[in-house]
Amino acid sequence: MRPLLAVSNAIDALNEKIGYVCNLLVLLACLVSAANAMIRYAFSYSSNGWLELQWYMFAILVMFGASYTFKRNEHVRVEIMYLMLSERGQLWLDMIGTLFFLIPSCLLLAYLSWPFFMQAYNVGEMSGNAGGLIRWPIKFVIPAGFVMLALQGVSEVIKRIAALQGYVTIDAKYERPTQ
C-alpha cells in the first residue's frame, strides 16, 4: 500500500501546484480584463489577442481547476443519501462513484477531445480574428484537464482503499459545511 500512497501523494502534490497556478490565473485574468476595459474606453483601442487571452485563462481555470477542486473535496455533491451512510459507507460510495463514473467519463472525454486538439495542431490553427492567438495550445487544455481529473480520481481511490484498510484516515466530509 505504501507505494500506492506515494503515487497518490505525487498526484496530490502536482494538483496542489496546478491549483496554485490557477489561483494566480484568477488574479491575472481579472487584471487583464480590467486593463482591457480601461484601455478600450480610455484610448478607444481594443486587441483581439488580449480578449482571447482572457478566455484562454478562463478555460485553463475551468479545466485544471476541476482536479484541484476534487483533491480538496469541494466539488458539488448531492448529499441526501451520502449523509445517511456511515463513514465507511461514504468511503465506499466515493470509491465506487470515482471508479465507475468519474474516471471512465474523464478518460472517454480526453480520448474524444484528443482528435480535436490534433487537428488544430496539425493545421496550425489560428484565431479567425485579426490579432488573435494560435488555437491549438488552448485546445490541448481540454484532454489534459480531463486526464488530470482522472489522475486525481485515481489518487482519491487509492486514499479510500487505504482508509478502508486502516492505513490512513480520511475526513470524507466537505472541507466547508454545506451552504
Could you say what each language-model-derived stretch is?
Residues 1-179:
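Alpha-helical transmembrane segments and membrane-interface helix-loop junctions
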